[in-house]
């Protein structure tokens, strides 16, 4: 079912895999693609205006409550940064693979506008982190302090995606690793293994190894619709102060 948003959504990367999922599940005012795309200038499903080839073509003055969703690639970050900075437009950064310089600029931008940093727009991943990983990591930390001198203890993440995915490891895997490391006081190295196949949408497994036994928890995306549906949480940006937010923040607010 299409979400009739009370905000004017601007979608960069409207014709990609993630962009298609967002379009399928949300009403989008302006969609942006590459200037070379043969669909530029044409009307496509769930897009209120013809597809544009640049953010410079967006009629920003016509929009009352614009929110920009980036579902493209890091190569577009500078133009997205400039657009959001100059127009004070809230940003949903759903693209992945950004370098340290870009992440630092994102942090600076968050002093001016609210930003939802969502390498994965799935509500399930947000639930997985907050309700499953978080308590598990807390208990792991306590256990680690007792047994680390007696047995080899380690954590590993395995991420599996389709072979058209550009970045490796996935942004979600990196986010999961950082999420865990930020909650463990002892120095721990978390290895990430990337697997590519013909059809996987996105599977992430976190393995806690205790020498002769291990505990595995995982999240598996079965449909791309979950990303488009998760993008609906962007409406909560309208009422937020400048800062960087996560899907977990908005998942709690939705409930």
Language-model features: locations:
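C-terminal substrate-binding/catalytic lobe of Rossmann-fold NAD(P)-dependent oxidoreductases
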Residues: 2-59, 141-255
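Proline-centered loop/turn at the N-terminus of a beta-strand
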Residues: 8, 90-92, 114-116
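Short glycine/proline-enriched coil/turn segments at helix->beta-strand junctions
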Residues: 24-29, 64, 87-89, 111-112
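Rossmann-fold NAD(P) dinucleotide-binding segment
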Residues: 58-94, 103-105
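Thr-Gly-centered strand-to-loop micro-motif
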Residues: 68, 93, 118, 193-195, ...
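Rossmann-fold NAD(P)-binding glycine/threonine-rich loop
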Residues: 75, 82, 95-118, 123-126, ...
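Conserved strand-to-helix beginnings and helix N-cap segments that scaffold or border functional pockets
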Residues: 78, 103, 128-130, 169-173, ...
């Amino acid at each position: 079912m299409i979400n009739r948003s009370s905000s004017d959504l601007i979608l960069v990367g409207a014709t990609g895999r993630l962009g298609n999922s967002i379009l399928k599940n949300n009403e989008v005012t302006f969609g942006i693609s590459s200037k070379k795309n043969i669909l530029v200038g044409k009307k496509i499903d769930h897009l209120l205006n013809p597809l544009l080839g640049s953010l410079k073509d967006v009629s920003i003055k016509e929009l009352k409550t614009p929110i920009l969703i980036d579902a493209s690639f890091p190569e577009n970050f500078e133009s997205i940064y400039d657009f959001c900075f100059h127009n004070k437009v809230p940003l949903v950064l759903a693209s992945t693979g950004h370098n340290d310089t870009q992440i630092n600029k994102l942090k600076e931008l968050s002093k001016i506008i609210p930003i939802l940093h969502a390498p994965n727009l799935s509500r399930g991943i947000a639930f997985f982190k907050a309700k499953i990983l978080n308590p598990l990591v807390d208990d792991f930390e306590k256990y680690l302090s007792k047994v680390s001198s007696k047995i080899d203890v380690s954590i590993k993440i395995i991420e599996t995606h389709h072979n058209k995915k550009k970045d490796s490891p996935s942004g979600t895997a990196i986010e999961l690793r950082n999420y865990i490391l930020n909650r463990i006081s002892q120095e721990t190295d978390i290895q990430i293994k990337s697997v590519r196949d013909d059809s996987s949408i996105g599977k992430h497994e976190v393995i806690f190894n205790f020498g002769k036994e291990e505990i595995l928890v995982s999240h598996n995306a079965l449909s791309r619709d979950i990303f488009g549906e998760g993008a609906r949480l962007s409406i909560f940006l309208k009422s937020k102060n400048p800062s960087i937010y996560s899907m977990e923040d908005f998942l709690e607010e939705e409930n």
